[in-house]
Amino acid sequence: MTEPDVAGAPASKPEPASTGAASAAQLSGYSRVLLKLGGEMFGGGQVGLDPDVVAQVARQIADVVRGGVQIAVVIGGGNFFRGAQLQQLGMERTRSDYMGMLGTVMNSLALQDFLEKEGIVTRVQTAITMGQVAEPYLPLRAVRHLEKGRVVIFGAGMGLPYFSTDTTAAQRALEIGADVVLMAKAVDGVFAEDPRVNPEAELLTAVSHREVLDRGLRVADATAFSLCMDNGMPILVFNLLTDGNIARAVRGEKIGTLVTT
């Protein structure tokens, strides 16, 4: 399952946010969020799981939940399998995508375990039925879990090949009535240029969906982005590797890049 990266380089300090409606929205904070995590980060750059990384993410999420915010999570599976890459090696695309979906379930179960060690009741819901390890994806049940203060992790992507976990994040956010998609990356946000090419590239702190589209800036894959743009769902792109950034994002502090209609 493909997950485009935001163009970026090693993290740098975010620039001051520009004024306007997007900044005003960011300052208001959020009560229900959909957190999108890339699978590669769970592996610490390697194949498999890095327990230290998963534990650090779980601690950040637990702090947010204890503050009364409802949080759902979508995790990629790139630390195990990436369907598009396996296809390039000759594997049939639909089969490789299903392998990627199973990778997201492994990540979901790992995060559930570390969250419950933090004392946070967590439910995993999967788009592919696997009753021994997770609930089936039922949006009304997911909302009920959130209202009870539980974390809900959505695994197995959309349950369909050719759809990325970015698209899953956008669709799930809309269906559960989230205020925002928090797109956690290994970079500070969205840049005007690729910082790997231009180290002085400007970090954009607030842009519109239309501007992202017109300028060809990479935030999420096209399907995910279209869903968010058409339905007015804001996306906040921020650096997960900075400890405490999930809580800062939820509080509406000026970090990363806020994309609004």
Curated annotation (Swiss-Prot):
Query: EC number(s) per UniProt?
Result: 2.7.4.22
Binding-site list for UMP: G77, D97, M158, G159, L160, P161, Y162, F163, S164, T165
Which coarse location class describes where this protein primarily resides?
cytoplasm
One cellular component (GO) term of this entry: plasma membrane
N-acetylthreonine, modified sites: T2
Q: In which pathway does it act?
A: Pyrimidine metabolism; CTP biosynthesis via de novo pathway; UDP from UMP (UMPK route): step 1/1
The record's Gene Ontology biological-process terms are: 'de novo' CTP biosynthetic process; UDP biosynthetic process
| Protein keywords | Acetylation, ATP-binding, Cytoplasm, Kinase, Nucleotide-binding, Pyrimidine biosynthesis, Transferase
Asked whether the UniProt record includes Membrane among its keywords, one would answer no
What's a Pfam family this protein contains?
A: AA_kinase
Question: What is stated as this protein's family in its record?
Answer: Belongs to the UMP kinase family.
Entry-linked HAMAP family: PyrH_B
Q: What does this protein do?
A: Catalyzes the reversible phosphorylation of UMP to UDP.
The protein's name in its UniProt record: Uridylate kinase
- UniProt lists the gene as pyrH
